[in-house]
């Protein structure tokens, strides 16, 4: 009888742990839906950045994944601003307005 109770308690404990793990990991990451972030997402979509870059592992493969761009050491908003404005050997330069650039950088910070 005690073996049945031991197995039953082990089953209940593992079931409780499984439910806890599922609930803790099923929360969606929160992206701040501020007006600036939404405007930056629109700029990102209008210029078809996803054709070359990935966000959360989805998108093109020509350019780098932008998911952690803003927190990567040696990168960040100043680096992104310079690369977007001047371009490089694989990326064209974009002449964005200051407002569009600020919104795009805010969007990239939100997906960081």
How would you describe each model-predicted region?
Residues 22-44:
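Electrostatic cytochrome c docking/interface patches
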Residues 2-24, 93-112:
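C-terminal capping alpha-helices of c-type cytochrome domains
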Residues 3-7, 16-18, 29-34, 56-59, ...:
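Generic detector of short, locally flexible boundary/turn motifs and exposed helical patches
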Residues 49-52:
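Short cysteine clusters
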Residues 38, 42, 56, 60, ...:
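Extracytoplasmic electron-transfer domains, predominantly the class I c-type cytochrome c fold
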